[in-house]
Design a protein with these regions (language model features):
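Generic N-terminal targeting/processing segments that precede catalytic cores or assembly contacts
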Residues: 1-107, 131
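Conserved phosphate/anionic-ligand binding catalytic regions in large, soluble enzymes, centered on
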Residues: 106-124
Length: 156
């Protein structure tokens, strides 16, 4: 298991493999499963993340009605063209808020690394997908890379 970023970078250079590939190999070894099973699970996680973003951007409210709708309002503001920061950064923020609002409404999210911060990774991926039209394979590599960095945090 990865214990430092230095270790990840060294191994990546030594084996001439991207970090995402090292993480896939580690998952196979640790869990005794096939590559296909690892990729299938991560694809499901990605789909859950992106569905939560879309649901939240459409506007959801918590069961109590105390929270919700902020992601949709932020997206409407972004679309108005009045932001001085531009849309790229705010699209990520809106997606992160959207995920957290789905969580507050008891909807399905991928709690990575925790439910409280579950919007960060989907927010980043959503913003990059919008800006650069990245394909699903690239998004999955991003998730595996983030997972490797998560191992460093967990192991320290």
């Amino acid at each position: 298991m990865f214990t430092s970023l230095e270790e990840i970078v060294r191994k990546s250079k030594l084996e001439n493999k991207p970090v995402s590939e090292l993480m896939i190999e580690q998952e196979i070894e640790l869990n005794g499963v096939t590559r296909s099973a690892v990729e299938k699970l991560m694809k499901r996680n990605l789909n859950v993340m992106m569905q939560a973003v879309e649901e939240g951007l459409a506007g959801v409210r918590s069961k109590t009605g105390l929270t919700g709708g902020d992601a949709k309002r932020l997206q409407e503001y972004i679309n108005s063209g009045k932001s001085i920061t531009g849309s790229d950064f705010l699209n990520g923020v809106a997606a992160a808020i959207a995920t957290n609002e789905v969580n507050a409404s008891l909807g399905l999210i991928c709690a990575t690394p925790t439910a409280g911060s579950a919007g960060v990774l989907p927010g980043c991926i959503h913003a990059l997908k919008q800006k650069f039209d990245i394909d699903e394979e690239t998004q999955l590599k991003m998730l595996f890379t983030a997972g490797a960095f998560g191992f460093v945090v967990a192991n320290n």
